[in-house]
Amino acid sequence: MASSMLSNAAMATTAATAGAQASMVAPFNGLKSFATFPITKKSSNDFSSLPSNGGRVQCMQVWPPVGKKKFETLSYLPPLSDAQLLAQVQYLLNKGWIPCIEFELEHPFVYRENHRSPGYQDGRYWTMWKLPMYGCTDPAQVLNEVEEAKKAYPSAFIRIIGFDNKRQVQCVSFIAYKPAGGL
């Protein structure tokens, strides 16, 4: 008897909630038709609504990819003068980075000779000139080493690297010297 009263009470509660839920949620009638939304079609030759940057598009040029290969940082600038090189080396010394000098005789750009996937011998790693210049505080000392590297290898590309020994990463790299017939 108690079980039948309990089940009747549970059924009544369930029926009451089902009725309340049915009245709260509208039934799904499918997607609305597009007849209520007016669609205006613009003519294909109307350019008045296109975004504009005030005519600067005519001034933009693409960098020519043939005969003007680029290297690393600062490579879109003209070759750096000695004063500009001194300023760049002073910057990396002020940051606490260690200057390193590297050179490359044959392939100054990344290339793939042995495999299609990147590897150790694909032109990313250049030969280091002497040792990293630990404890160097004078940018002129770095440029003297660049001059020595130029005398030893006049046909080599020479770059200066700023190495952070705390994070153990290369932070800056720029070309210090390109040979006369260089790319």
Curated annotation (Swiss-Prot):
Keyword Chloroplast: yes
GO molecular-function terms, A-Z: ribulose-bisphosphate carboxylase activity
Primary residence: plastid
Gene Ontology CC, one term: chloroplast
Alphabetical UniProt keywords: Calvin cycle, Carbon dioxide fixation, Chloroplast, Photorespiration, Photosynthesis, Plastid, Transit peptide
One GO term of the biological process aspect: reductive pentose-phosphate cycle
Gene3D superfamilies in the cross-refs: Ribulose bisphosphate carboxylase, small subunit
SUPFAM superfamilies tied to this protein: RuBisCO, small subunit
Cellular localisation: Plastid, Chloroplast
Pfam family membership, one: RuBisCO_small
SMART domains noted in UniProt: RuBisCO_small
Transit peptide extent on chain: 1-58
Role this protein plays: RuBisCO catalyzes two reactions: the carboxylation of D-ribulose 1,5-bisphosphate, the primary event in carbon dioxide fixation, as well as the oxidative fragmentation of the pentose substrate. Both reactions occur simultaneously and in competition at the same active site. Although the small subunit is not catalytic it is essential for maximal activity.
Oligomer status and interactors: Heterohexadecamer of 8 large and 8 small subunits.
Further comment: The basic functional RuBisCO is composed of a large chain homodimer in a 'head-to-tail' conformation. In form I RuBisCO this homodimer is arranged in a barrel-like tetramer with the small subunits forming a tetrameric 'cap' on each end of the 'barrel'.
HAMAP family: RuBisCO_S_bact (MF_00859)
Family from the record: Belongs to the RuBisCO small chain family.
Protein name: Ribulose bisphosphate carboxylase small subunit, chloroplastic 1
